[in-house]
Swiss-Prot record:
GO cellular component: cytosolic large ribosomal subunit; extracellular region
One Pfam family here: Ribosomal_L35Ae
Keyword Ribosomal protein: yes
A GO molecular-function descriptor: mRNA binding
Protein name listed in UniProt: Large ribosomal subunit protein eL33w
UniProt record similarity statement: Belongs to the eukaryotic ribosomal protein eL33 family.
Cystine connections: none
Name of encoding gene: RPL35AA
Organism: Arabidopsis thaliana (Mouse-ear cress)
Single GO biological process annotation from the record: translation
Length: 112
């Protein structure tokens, strides 16, 4: 039996930043969030992330299932603008305290 890890590390996710809810001048739509993915700057680069899963991980005061950490899952739906921002729908709407915090954008499911 071999101890330790052999070969290269596999990258499972990239980091993203939650910018806010999708909105117009006077209305906001909390069922869709805007996320800036690190290293993505154009609409063409966003197309690879379409359909990918993302997770907002946060820490709660009370334990559930033996852990203080909880997760809200989401999915990249489409690009937003020309600067590499994506629109994402989450299973439940993100809380307002999540604005500006990190999200994990996973490299699966693959559509290659």
């Amino acid at each position: 039996m071999v101890k330790g890890r052999q070969g290269e590390r596999v990258r499972l996710y990239v980091r993203g930043t939650i910018l806010g809810y999708k909105r117009s001048k006077s209305n906001q739509y909390p069922n869709t969030s805007l996320v800036q993915v690190e290293g993505v700057n154009t609409t063409e680069e966003v197309s690879w992330y379409k359909g990918k899963r993302m997770a907002y991980i946060y820490k709660a005061k009370t334990k559930k299932n033996g852990s203080h950490y909880r997760c809200i899952w989401g999915k990249v739906t489409r690009p937003h603008g020309n600067s590499g921002v994506v629109r994402a729908k989450f299973t439940s709407n993100l809380p307002p305290k999540s604005m500006g915090s990190r999200v994990r954008v996973f490299m699966y499911p693959s559509n290659i």
